[in-house]
Amino acid sequence: MANILNIFNQFPKNYDLTILQTFFAKPFKQENGKWTKPSLSLVAKDNNTGKKHVCEIEDPEYIWFLAKDPDKLTHHYDFLPKDEVEAIQCPNRELEKCIAQATGNMKFFTNNIANGEYRENAKLHTLNQVFFSDQNIEDHYRFWFNRLFKNEIHSVRKAYLDIEVDISDIVGDFPEPGEAPVNVVTYINDGVINTYILRDPKNPLVQEFENQVASGEIERDLRKLIEFAIGDETRQRKFNIFGYNFNVKFFDQEIQLLGSLFRQINTEEPDFLMAWNMAFDIPYLIQRIRNLGYRPESIMCHPDFKLNPKAEYFIDTRMENNYAERGDYAYISAYTVYLDQMIQFASRRKGQSAFASFKLNDIGAQICGVQKLNYHHITTDLAKLPFLDFKTFVFYNIVDVLVQVCIEESTDDIGYIYNSSVLNNTRFSKVHRQTIYLRNKQIDFYFNLGLVVGNNINKTREKPSEKFDGAFVADPNLVNDSVKLKINGIPVFLCDNLVDFDFSSLYPSINREFNLSSPSEIGKIEFEDDKDASSAIIEDIVTQDHLTIGHRWFGLPNYSELVDQVSTLFASGRLSTENEFKVYNKGKLVKPLEVEYNECIPALTRFGSMNMNAIYGERQMPGGL
């Protein structure tokens, strides 16, 4: 396939490039009233040289497919062979207009625009003849990149970041974004602990600390601290931190500190930069730069990014307190991917209830046995710590980042996320969302088989306000106590070794086992007098007419037949056993005991009618019963 989307067209096809990052910038209205064009930036690594490259595309295009013979399509198809569709390329911002033109629905399209009902045009993607038109634009370019270049997975370089803020003069209990100066930042990359410190004329301990750094005392103390916090050489080698170097920089002006920090990041170009709870660090730095009178893009972005550079961080407020479901992401125009390490950790372990807290200290203790530095023997107020013991304050910041390193070295979450992103052609913000990455993988897998997938027609459908009331739930009070666990001899509603016949799980399991899907269904074979009894049996069960249910569905006698059989049984006179009773004493057969019966009471009266109180007999066994 030709590189018609102009993705890294300076490289030949099948060149050893691997996609790292994608940025899509939506159009926005400028001060002059005109709208900008959207843009897409792709970052890839040359695996032959290790160098990274950026591909900036203004007004990115989309390739979708239209059925050649739409009249043959009687319903929505999950896929069609490539030879039955034709590819259509158009600007992504005009995708729905292009679909409307190609399918003869321009009137529908223009009416929606005129009425301000822009979302209604999304229904154009549900047309039977339209295929592969509903993929996210970033994932779409990842898909075509994967078909143009090798896109093989290699090891990645990881960096770590944490900031501290001077909160001694803030108004509330917690600083607002950009409210107070950033006084300490630690950035760890390539075996070097880089610590940036803001000088403070109000705090003489900062100058004292600087003198101790110059004398080498701080580095010696730091190595002792690492051994105390993490362990001996064996433990340090386990987490790949043995022999870390220490580099401290002091600044008189805060903007110089921040500028130097991001210059170093953009010079070293680590593949990933992580912070624990990045939703605080990066938005705070962005706003702090603004408060200091500078544009964040001029400080944080790499100079190679010329087309619409951005320094933004998006917080998923819908899932703000559910870390496993949060979709935060950073849009910082650079060769480095900024990721929230806490969200990645929680998302990868979604559904596991082992972690009651995702605080750095708690996760560090559970995962790798490394915790934050405890300063409470000095003060319980972090705002006072730099004025009481500045060295401990700095070391507290450094140990925080070391805990991050130990967690990642123990879990390799970022390696997993990177692999998933490359293998599934999925942007990092959605790499944990199963419906999205499986859909992207399906698109790629089917395309390799010569098939073009259809669209997800459920996206535009209104979701029902109430769930379908189709399940039959038995009264739990009818569950036998024999299967229940007992507490102090009292059975509770808790079962061990429970088998849950959950249809919501059963149906997908059956589909997977028999490789079923809607496109593989040719039709339904109906036999003569064959009835679909699934709904009827549920309706009968709900009526609780047990005799009717037993007769109709399980071949048991109805009421009249039951009475006849019972009356025949109990009107037959004396009951006798077919074999004699055998009695054993200490394992030896002894003389059988004689069993005496009273005459059975006839079940039928002299009038031939049923006496309901007479359907039983009496017998007297030796010893009495």
Summary of predicted features, one role per range:
Residues G624-L625:
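Long, K/E/R/D-enriched contiguous segments that form extended
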Residues M1-N488, V492-V499, F503-S504, P508-L589, ...:
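The two-metal-ion catalytic cores of nucleic-acid processing enzymes
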